[in-house]
Amino acid sequence: MILQDFEKKIFKFIRDYKIFNKYDKILLGVSGGKDSMSLLHVMSKLSKTMGFEISVAHLNHCMREEADNDEAFVRQACWKLKIPFFSKKVDVFTYSKKNKVGVEVAGRKLRYEFFYETLRRLSYNKIATAHHMDDLFETMIYRILRGTGIYGLGGLIPIEEEITKPMLCVDLEEIKNYVTINNIEYVEDKYNYSLDYARNKIRYEITPLFKKINPRYKESFFRLAKIIWSYREEVKRKFEERSEISKDSLKLRLENDFFDGEIIRIAFLKFGKYPPNMEETEKIIKMRKGGVRKINGLSITKKSDSLLVKI
């Protein structure tokens, strides 16, 4: 099967970062927008080239009058491509008010809950989302503004456990060209243009300033992200070397080097907890022997040259 340049680029990225193999069963998150419809068409072709299996999951957020039409649109697209389709309807606005969280946070939580629920039901092993280079840039800027360490600066990751992002190597302009050249239909989401969301403020107010300074700013950030992804792999190796994990606790060996702080933050992630900031991490490292700190639902006890982290 002949691949277009856009598809070849994604195929190379998948191989470089070992995102998929022929034994994988992959659930695609498809909303119907141009980015996820590109993902659908590219993965449909690559499934034949690489031999993996795909299905589609679509969450109807009930956030727009056209939401039911969007669901029907994606269902029809999957039918044409002979790809299994699974959907669920939720009321994001009601969930947002009831749980006192932002609409964006609520939507993401419900979306991934549905993805994992479907993943388990189908006995699949990976989820693929349509995040692209523009999303990567925006996430990196957002994290810098909020405050982050090197480990978190990488923004979005090509593969992390079940979640994969095979389109991080292409930007929005390339996606627009791909859907235009191939006459791929898609739906437009008005919330993508709402300046009520911090990420869209970055997209429509801050990004143009970067473009004036360096028209190829996204490629610069992508190169930086790749360096950080390599760094993250080294941090993970250090964590494996220095940690002993049991059912409800984790022992970390400290070696008085830069990686101590990084492996402490990974320990929090292992327990599904938000990691402490750099200042709080430094306080943990400097605790006296026998000292105890409780942070984000975890208890941390300082031993002579190690930390015991417990739920």
UniProtKB/Swiss-Prot annotation:
Q: Which reaction does it catalyse?
A: cytidine(34) in tRNA(Ile2) + L-lysine + ATP = lysidine(34) in tRNA(Ile2) + AMP + diphosphate + H(+)
* Enzyme class name: ligase
Which EC numbers characterise this protein's activity in its record?
6.3.4.19
Q: Give a yes or no for keyword Zinc-finger in this entry.
A: no
Chain sites annotated for binding ATP: S31, G32, G33, K34, D35, S36
What is recorded about the protein's domains?
The N-terminal region contains the highly conserved SGGXDS motif, predicted to be a P-loop motif involved in ATP binding.
What name does UniProt use for this protein?
Answer: tRNA(Ile)-lysidine synthase
